[in-house]
Amino acid sequence: MTAVLWLNLVGLSAEQIGEHTPHLAEWARQGSMAPMGGILPGVTCSAQATLLTGTLPRDHGAVANGWLDRRSMEVGLWRQSNHWVQGEKIYETARRRDPAFRCAKLFWWWNMGAAVDWSITPRPYYPADGRKIPAVYSWPPAYGQDLEQAIGPFPFFDFWGPKAGLPSSRWIAEA
């Protein structure tokens, strides 16, 4: 089986790959880059579910970054369970075709409960007092613990929002 590294680099276009991105430029020169079209809505959860299933939001069900629970009438934002996404994922197809297939799914959405060998994703805790405690979800559970022991805690507040930047990207690359 051929090894594949699939990088989901949101917002990166072919025009931005060059002198300041030497490793990506080398991969592109080797024929390892392919253009992809967008979908609507162009939001994280919908886009990643489309990439993973090859289907549109109307089919996989991830129509936004939030979900309305019709029983409670509450919106849950940024759900991470793989079970929210309907349809066969690319790694499920690969494993069906070759039972020896192995997959690591790092920092994609829909990681929790995904049928992969290793996964890790940001998963903060929100205690009743309103705090946000940075943490990661991983499978197997020791995987995230081992990574944090080896390379330090995940720089959660450098991953999202106004501080998003290189510290989290470096941590993910090291992982």
Role assignments for model-derived ranges:
Residues 1-2, 40-43, 83-88:
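Short, exposed beta-strand "edge-strand" segments with a Pro/Gly-rich flavor and a Y/T-containing core
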